[in-house]
Amino acid sequence: PMTDLLAAGDISKAVSAFAAPESFNHKKFFELCGLKSKSKEIMQKVFHVLDQDQSGFIEKEELCLILKGFTPEGRSLSDKETTALLAAGDKDGDGKIGVDEFVTLVSES
């Protein structure tokens, strides 16, 4: 579970900060949950938790569930939020986010 990688309190705080529809901001979220300050190895482990089908990529369907990937209490992202997150993370334009793209996305300020 994600709580093996990040503090439960930080996850809870980060997810509740974006409880309102259309409020998701990935930069603030990764900062609040503590992931941004973690090592590349931890970021890669988080990626593999979020990559539910273990395809090596986080596809749009999985991105929509990113908050639920951190905690079951998380909400699904709206289509607009998901599209914006995909656009921010998909550097090579293949329509999905690979592990290196994810690490870059989390690390960007």
From Swiss-Prot:
Ca(2+) 2 binds at D90, D92, D94, K96, E101. GO terms for molecular function: calcium ion binding. Ca(2+) 1 binds at D51, D53, S55, F57, E59, E62. It comes from the Eukaryota. Keywords: Calcium, Metal-binding, Muscle protein, Repeat. One of its GO terms (cellular component) is cytoplasm. PROSITE patterns: EF_HAND_1, EF_HAND_2. InterPro entries: EF-hand-dom_pair, EF_Hand_1_Ca_BS, EF_hand_dom, Parvalbumin. Residues 38-73, 77-109 form the EF-hand domain. Belongs to the parvalbumin family. This parvalbumin has an isoelectric point of 4.88. In muscle, parvalbumin is thought to be involved in relaxation after contraction. It binds two calcium ions. This is Parvalbumin alpha. The lineage of its organism: Eukaryota, Metazoa, Chordata, Craniata, Vertebrata.
